[in-house]
């Protein structure tokens, strides 16, 4: 039950982040809906296709798809001036969704019978996949390709999650919560103190 509600939370939060970005780019309602939905379900879709574990999650159970659509519509109706929102709103919402989806991705990979390395990779894909699709559609450089500490937070949280469960035998839900908190703390710290990774620069 906890995983279900966390999944709903992550879906809604990522949908909101997609809608807010669409609003900043002055997209029409259809563009808003597309950007919000792909942000919410994109990462999980890539994960399920990679695991080849039957139909993707929103085909088997459209709950996440419905939640994403409803969230998009409500955000579109209630947030009339996204350009006036504080700059930290979108990054913080994205960080929450990121942490939740990394944990869910690791859990689903373990449920599919994978080892810890693949589980970590699936967690990262679940966390960043929707954001990559969102940024590509919005013609922005995906966050994962910038010097922001983004994928790093996913990887470390995924490692903590997988290690706690696979190596130390911690119950899966507890390991998930631990990994999520680590991912969220790292990402929020990076946002708060503008922490970045060094850039790779080649001089001409």
Annotate each predicted stretch with a short phrase.
Residues 69-108:
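Ordered, amphipathic secondary-structure segments that act as subunit-interaction surfaces
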Residues 1-11, 56-70, 115-127:
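Structural signature of hydrophobic alpha-helical transmembrane segments
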Residues 1-41, 45-52:
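N-terminal topogenic module of multi-pass integral membrane proteins
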Residues 30-38, 61-65, 86-97, 122, ...:
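Cytoplasmic-side transmembrane-helix entry/capping segments in multi-pass membrane proteins
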Residues 170-204:
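Long hydrophobic alpha-helical segments typical of transmembrane helices together
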Residues 15-25, 48, 74-87, 132-143, ...:
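C-terminal ends of transmembrane helices
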Residues 1-5, 49-59, 105-118, 163-174:
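Helix-coil boundary and interhelical linker segments in multi-pass alpha-helical membrane proteins
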Residues 14, 35-43, 63, 67-71, ...:
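Alpha-helical transmembrane segments in multi-pass membrane proteins
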């Amino acid at each position: 039950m906890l995983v279900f509600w966390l999944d709903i939370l992550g879906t809604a939060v990522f949908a909101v982040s997609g809608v807010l970005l669409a609003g900043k780019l002055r997209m029409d309602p259809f563009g808003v809906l597309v950007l919000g939905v792909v942000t919410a379900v994109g990462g999980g879709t890539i994960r399920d296709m990679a695991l080849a574990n039957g139909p993707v999650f929103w085909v088997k159970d459209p709950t996440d798809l419905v939640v994403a659509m409803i969230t998009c519509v409500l955000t579109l109706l209630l947030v009339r001036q996204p350009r006036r929102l504080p700059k930290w709103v979108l990054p913080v919402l994205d960080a929450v969704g990121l942490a939740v989806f990394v944990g869910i991705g690791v859990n689903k990979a373990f449920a599919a019978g994978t080892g810890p390395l693949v589980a970590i990779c699936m967690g990262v894909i679940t966390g960043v996949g929707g954001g990559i699709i969102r940024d590509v559609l919005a013609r922005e450089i995906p966050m994962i390709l910038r010097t922001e500490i983004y994928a790093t937070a996913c990887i470390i949280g995924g490692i903590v999650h997988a290690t706690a469960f696979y190596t130390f035998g911690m119950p899966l839900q507890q390991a998930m919560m631990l990994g999520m908190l680590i991912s969220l703390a790292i990402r929020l710290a990076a946002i708060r103190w503008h922490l970045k990774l060094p850039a790779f620069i080649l001089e001409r």
